[in-house]
Amino acid sequence: MGGVAGHAGLFSNAYDLAQLYQLLLNGGSLNGTQLLKPATIQLFTSYGSTSSRRGLGFDKPEKDNATRKDPYPSRNAPPETFGHTGFTGIGVWADPVNNLQYIFMSNRVNPSRSNNLISQLNIRSQIQDAIYESIRR
């Protein structure tokens, strides 16, 4: 593709992402209107296979999170959690068990695409861990 890929081209804001993920947490309903069937939400937010953390529509927690050195997306995220961590620094996750959304927006590619400090320091996961730990107190 000559160095051009079909990812990292979708952009939004925290409010719109919160609306989308609330729709998903509500089983396809938002503001009293059923927009998607609950079965569709269940299909898209489930593990797609036994050998991968990927689902049909979203990433899922690693199945061995409890024993991983670097759990994904968070050591404390239950298996029902679904979301996506993006190239440009975004992390958007929904946890139906705790009725929780985690939306992290940054500009990882500033000042250049080679800036990978956010991943090297595991910032997104550490913040998500801190949120879960504060809820459990």
Regions found by a protein language model. Give the residues of each.
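Catalytic loop of the DD-peptidase/beta-lactamase superfamily, centered on the K-T-G motif
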Residues: M1-R137
